[in-house]
Amino acid sequence: DIPLGKLILNVQNGSSSSIRLSLRAANTAAPVLADVRRTSIYGGLGAVEVQTLDNTKISTRTVIDDIVYDQSEEMHWIRLRQQDPSTSLWSMCEVRTFSSKLGARTSICVDWLYTGVTF
């Protein structure tokens, strides 16, 4: 589990050649309003896959990607904007994932673009 503000990013083995990424609220009794954009590039031909969750309340497990290939076959990005349920302030981060050797070498990098702002 990787804490991302008021959300938790969960990373699990998906199959023999993939990992699974999901989000949940750190406190499931306090859902978090979020905007999520996921982009993946995978395979030898560079297939592109995108997913958008706009203005979505996240409390329990929300799957972001069921199949992230873990043999150096996929570049994976998540742009995540979330509103703190207690302060109503917004934060945004980018999460980059790259997984190799059947998940034995998985790197997840988090960069915060801003925290504690209003719109």
Name each region found by the language model.
Residues 1-119:
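Extracellular jelly-roll beta-sandwich "head" domains, especially the C-terminal globular C1q domain
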